Amino acid sequence: MKFGCFSSKFLPMIALRSLCLLTFLFFTAAPSHAAVAPDTHIHVIVSLVDNVAQGIVPVPAKIGNGDDPRSNLYWGAAYGVKTFLSKAEGWRKLGCENNINDIILERCQFAWKDKLTVTADAYRGSRIDQAMLDFMQEAANPPNAAEREMVAFIGHDGLMDEQNQPIIERFPKHAGHGKQAVVLACMSDEFFTGHLLAAGSKPVVTTFSFMAPEAYVLEAIARGFADQASEAELRSSAGIAYAKYQRISAKAGKAVFGVKNSN
């Protein structure tokens, strides 16, 4: 499905720009045969799309309610994080918890084979500022030496919106530590990479254009991370997955992802 900032085929560029759009790990016990590797983990912060609270070109009301993760485009819809990872080959949902607080409306944990766990948090759409701040704070937190950690943000690129600019003053600074970070949002290399570097983290997948931050891209990156893929391989996997679901060429898909503004 292509909505809003996700497809330049359907919206003019000016409209697209306006749209561009723990923590302790909770999980329900899996069966005894379903052991997972506790030392390889991704925390995904999902800012639910919100027709009212975000400065976007509205998507259909059913998938654009930022207070209802169940059918939200980035969470409960077909290519939303919860639905897609629950059904993708090799993945299983370990458990979910509703209403973590007034901002995090649902938290789910997933596992891919026995190699990786993913914790995904669905943030209320009107609190995209807090979602971005929490993402940056986690990116600034050095990884545990005994673990492999990645943090990812999925949603509208709130840093494009003037109303969210004050949150930048609260973004943390830290000496370099190399925690890998991913931002699946429109034009995220331009808007996030510099802040991630200042936070000490290592941006490995960001975007150069308007795009659909849907879960098939996250899924491809996660599998690569579990298999200890290089940064270039992670970006290539993201592009190939994007091309498949957007029905574009592999070359065009790969051109969406990269990190130009890194050291």
Language-model regions, residue ranges each:
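N-terminal secretory signal peptides that target proteins for export/translocation
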Residues: 1-14
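A domain-level signal for caspase-like cysteine endopeptidase catalytic cores
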Residues: 38-140
